Regions:
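A short, conserved, highly charged catalytic patch centered on acidic carboxylates
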Residues: 1-96, 103-122
């Protein structure tokens, strides 16, 4: 078990949860994000399917600005993983997406209006 500082409860420490908790701690401790602007396992508003975003980051006005999709370290980050996070973003329409397995991280900036994206160096 590990204490999730966002949900304020202990959760089962699976490999994916290890990645999520380490990324959350990085956001708070290194990125300076206030815990109150970070959501965990937030339900996607796009579809009626029971899908949840691993991490959703808001700006200081409360608007969502970034989705983080966490995978277990043994999962290869491929097109299927990106398709998943892009699908989640149809409901949130955030400008930034991050995919991580704790070992490899990809970030991209989304230009929703022009249907383009740009990978960022992280």
């Amino acid at each position: 078990m590990i204490l999730d500082p966002i949900r304020k409860k202990y959760v089962r420490l699976t490999p994916e949860e290890w990645v999520r908790q380490n990324f959350i701690r990085y956001l708070i401790n290194e990125g300076g994000y206030p815990p109150g602007l970070i959501g965990v396992e937030v339900k996607s508003r796009f579809s009626n399917l029971n899908r949840r975003v691993d991490i959703l980051i808001h700006d200081r006005t409360g608007a969502p600005v970034m989705i983080v999709e966490c995978k277990s370290p043994e999962i290869t980050l491929n097109d299927k993983v990106f398709d998943q996070i892009v699908c989640y973003n149809l409901g949130f329409r955030v400008p930034y997406l991050i995919v991580t397995n704790g070992l490899v991280h990809y970030a991209c900036r989304i230009d929703i209006e022009n249907n383009k994206y740009e990978f960022l160096h992280v």
